[in-house]
Amino acid sequence: MKMIERNKTAETAALLIHPMLSSAEGIELCVTRFWGDSVHCFLPDLSSHGAAAGETYHSAWEEAKAIHDYLVEQNCTHLQLGFGASLGGVVLFELLKFEDLSFDHVFFEGVSFYERAPLLCFMLNWWAF
């Protein structure tokens, strides 16, 4: 995980985690460039994405831990907004397990937490033959 920060002196802080096959740069182009200088933006590139493309992605928990450790090192444990899309939403969900981090608002976009879907498993097994 590599972190990009924008507007480090702003008092309002937001963490925006990109979806799979995107990057921090994608979030910046679509969102943060329209916010001006009033929000301190933390934009992580998850492993195997963007600036961290050479790193191996292992799990959402490991990415969340790396983001957590970075935020704590920067003394930023309270954020006004946490946003995660797709894979980024799963990582954000893992971040909520850290009791020393707090968010005023969290927003999950296109995140599925459903595991072992019986119909999907049946269909995948059927198509495999």
Where are the model-predicted features located?
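Active-site signature of alpha/beta-hydrolase-fold catalytic machinery across serine-
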Residues: 29, 94-98
